[in-house]
């Protein structure tokens, strides 16, 4: 089922498209949490810390792949909005072929550089081997993640956010089952958690591809489309690489933050990991709003309706503020009971809770600027402006780097936790100003005369 987001009142259209994305994102976080909870309870706190210590590296590799595939699908959304059926099929086939190339590159670099990277990040010795085992399996199976993200992005590009949700729910259930079987029954430890993630995402990717060919003929390429088109590749890379680099740059900043956290020992790492999982869960609405705005702005940019893009941004910002306030209250309420899910009874929660509270209580104050980043960044990307969001990632990196270096110099865990808020405020200001600049640039260069006339 396709969804034309160039018609109807912006807010209801956005919220209707966004709802399945929120549910899907929450399920994705739940099965990520399932890995962590099952590892923490059935393998131990050190194993939990090991998995958690690789989170920022996963953000780097998985985030890069998400960025590149999302960039490839921007052209699909724009052509769908412009009713260019042939262009849609060409963009899909070309994106798949380019993704195969990037799969080989990302896997090779990850496998070759993982051990030095873990050492560079101050990974504690008592969790190093488990961390290395977990992230190596994830890196080897990155093809499953890349192609699930790619096919889901294509479905969302034409307005279908429900089917990716269905497959994600199935994947989440499969992941939990595999976690229990591989970790508890087969005693595979962190390796079992990694394999459960890869297998479940691979199944979802296959289901998405089958659905596209059976139920979405407008997306399914024919034999003549299966080749690398030079201009198409340049266009997709011009959009995908900046988006991928934006993820990679942001991830580099979180890796610096993780390095600072690692200096405080495995208890701090385990507590921070659990707290960040809870925070990631309640902030998924912000991410879903961003994903929605990428499709919304892409389709409307393809149609040439710039006024409608601005209306959508205004509505989404207002909704995001309400969500950010609700999320801040919710995470504070859930933190203590949720933290207990990650650890067995022989772990002293009184020693774990202060680490988690410090991070969460400092972060919730800045949820509003965090929510605005997703709106501005994804709107810019949907309109084909990839460079400025990438530079927004650079601003996050600089902010995290400065705060992390100071925290390591003075030995302050609280200051290390401030890395995220500092990055959010910096990026919110940068992307907000960039959005205003781009809207003026678009109106001057691209807005259709009839649209401009109707606004006078």
Where are these regions (language model features)?
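Short runs within selected transmembrane alpha-helices of multi-pass transporters and secretion channels
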Residues: 69, 138-156, 164-172, 193-206, ...
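Residue-level signal for short hydrophobic patches within transmembrane helices
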Residues: 7, 11-30, 34, 57-64, ...
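Transmembrane alpha-helix boundary and packing residues in multipass membrane permease domains
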Residues: 21, 25, 37, 74, ...
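Helix-terminus/linker motif at the lipid-water interface of multi-pass membrane proteins
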Residues: 26, 30-48, 118-125, 181-188, ...
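Transmembrane helical elements of multi-pass membrane transporters/channels
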Residues: 16-35, 137, 171, 200-204, ...
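Interfacial/gating helices of multi-pass transporter permease domains
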Residues: 39-59, 125-130, 190-191, 232-239, ...
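Small-residue-rich hydrophobic transmembrane alpha-helices
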Residues: 48-108, 145-164, 271-335, 370-392
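Short alpha-helical transmembrane segments in multi-pass integral membrane proteins
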Residues: 1-18, 76-143, 185-241, 297-365, ...
């Amino acid at each position: 089922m396709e969804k034309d987001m160039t018609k109807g009142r912006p807010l209801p259209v956005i919220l209707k498209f966004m709802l399945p994305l929120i549910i899907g994102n929450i399920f994705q976080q739940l099965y990520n949490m399932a890995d962590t909870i099952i590892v923490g309870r059935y393998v131990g706190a050190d194993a939990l810390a090991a998995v958690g210590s690789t989170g920022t590296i996963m953000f780097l590799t998985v985030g890069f792949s998400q960025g590149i595939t999302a960039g490839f699908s921007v052209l699909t959304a724009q052509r769908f909005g412009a009713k260019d059926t042939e262009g849609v099929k060409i963009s899909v086939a070309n994106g798949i072929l380019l993704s195969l190339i990037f799969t080989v590159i990302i896997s090779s670099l990850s496998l070759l550089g993982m051990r030095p990277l873990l050492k560079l990040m101050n990974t504690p010795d008592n969790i190093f081997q488990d961390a290395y085992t977990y992230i190596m399996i994830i890196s080897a199976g990155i093809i499953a993640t890349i192609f699930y993200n790619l096919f889901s992005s294509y479905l969302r590009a034409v307005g279908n956010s429900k089917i990716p949700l269905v497959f994600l729910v199935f994947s989440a259930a499969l992941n939990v089952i595999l976690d229990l079987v591989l970790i508890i029954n087969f005693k595979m430890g962190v390796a079992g958690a990694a394999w459960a993630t890869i297998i479940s995402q691979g199944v979802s990717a296959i289901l998405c591809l089958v659905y596209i060919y059976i139920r979405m003929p407008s997306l399914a390429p024919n034999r003549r489309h299966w080749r690398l088109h030079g201009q198409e590749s340049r266009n997709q890379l011009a959009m995908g690489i900046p988006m991928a680099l934006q993820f990679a740059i942001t991830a580099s900043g979180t890796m610096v933050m993780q390095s600072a956290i690692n200096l405080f020992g495995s208890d701090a790492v385990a507590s921070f990991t659990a707290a960040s999982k809870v925070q990631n869960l309640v902030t998924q609405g912000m991410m879903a709003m961003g994903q929605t705005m990428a499709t919304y702005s892409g389709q409307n940019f393809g149609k040439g309706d710039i006024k409608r893009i601005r209306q959508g941004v205004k509505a989404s910002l207002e909704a995001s503020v309400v969500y950010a306030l609700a999320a801040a209250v919710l995470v504070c309420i859930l933190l203590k009971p949720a933290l207990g899910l990650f650890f067995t009874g022989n772990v002293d929660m009184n020693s774990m809770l202060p680490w988690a509270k410090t991070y969460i209580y400092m972060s919730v104050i800045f949820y509003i600027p965090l929510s605005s980043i997703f709106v501005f960044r994804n709107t810019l990307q949907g309109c084909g402006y990839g460079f400025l969001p990438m530079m927004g990632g650079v601003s996050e990196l600089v902010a995290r780097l400065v705060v992390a270096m100071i925290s390591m110099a003075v030995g302050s865990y609280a200051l290390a936790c401030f890395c995220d808020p500092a990055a959010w405020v910096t990026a919110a200001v940068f992307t907000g100003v960039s959005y205003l600049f781009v809207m003026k640039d678009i109106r001057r260069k691209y807005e259709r005369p009839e649209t401009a006339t109707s606004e006078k």
